[in-house]
Amino acid sequence: MSLTRTLIDVRPLRTSPAFRRLLFGRTASVLGSFMAMVAVMYQVWDMTHSTVWTGAVGLAQALPMVVVGLFGGSLADRGDRRRIFLVATVGQGVCSLLLAVQAFLGHVPVAVVLALLAVHSCFGSVSGPAAGVFVPRLLPKEEVAAGLALNQISAQAMMLLGPALGGLVLGWTGAGVCYLLDALSFALAFYGAFGLPSLPPDGEPSRTGVHGVLDRLRFLAGHRVVRGALLTDLSATVLAMPMGLFPLVNAERFGGSPRTLGLFLSAVAVGGVTASALSGSITRLGRPGLVMLCGSGTWGGALVLFGLTSSPWAGLGLLVLAGAADTTAVISRSTIVQTRTPDALLGRVTAAEQIVGQGGPNLGNLRGGLVAGWTSGTVALVSGGLMCLLAVVFVGASTPELREHAEPGVPHETTPELRDAAAPDVS
């Protein structure tokens, strides 16, 4: 296999100027968001010196993401996705500006900071599903997986760069400048999407409110491939997410050095960036379901071995492998969702994917913490990895369509429930 086919597929950057602008804006906004997150955590801790309040930062972001996300997808399936994204992006930028104002003023109650974060997350719950339809609408079917891989590697690179850069800016100038840079990043994201054409949903708009949410649930229940993709992701995150266990495992087995802990956290990201950079052969393979199952199984197996090893270097290698496997699975899952979902439902299903992608890891860290509290960090890691492996095997065995070769954009036969969910309401 040639090197050019192994490295990340950059055809979307050559063939689609609109995608190039979008990727530039998205990369900038992800960088700004990670810088702002460092500032938020530091500011809340500096104001309260309480782990309860710093924990509330995650709640202020996660709760609106779940609640508003249920209906944000329906909104994206009723109107022009470009306009919805632009309005929501302006809202996020305004929230970042208000965070900067409160940081410069000082002496603002911590509840105000959390409230601004919650509103910011509400806008993100709307912009995410709207942006989720851009790639399949802008790129040919055979380039969708490559476009998603480019999105993934840009996000992971900013995940590595953003916290470090945010810490430097925070130390030099304070939290207010971090928030201002975050607001600027949303201006760049606005620029990236401003030149897009109108992107209304194909066919009739979705039903409003709870009816639209129920349509999405009927689609997920009826489409075995998309349902299997989301269940596989939940198996990998809810059952085996290791991040919350790293401090305990580091203390139990590797001496408790903060440098080792930092390397553990970085190793997963390094694996993810490496997998994205070498994703060309994967995105061209045409079997995203099989790749996703293998990636999720490798993730679980690597975490089992990490829980059993006593060598920090072997542990780092296994975490790099786990990060690479997870990224491969995420790219493949997104490819399945983007290419197998009717456009009329894509906003709502993307919202479900967003909730799964963000809620699953939080639940997984909670599961790991509870099991470790009853037993040990090693037991929590090994049991989680084994349960992930068993769950992935079950999903793969019960959903043979996931293992089949399928050309991008060619859906499997759907059930009557699926067709009903995608059909417009005429009542």
Give the ranges of each region predicted by the language model.
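Alpha-helical transmembrane-bundle signature of multi-pass membrane transport and export proteins
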Residues: 1-427
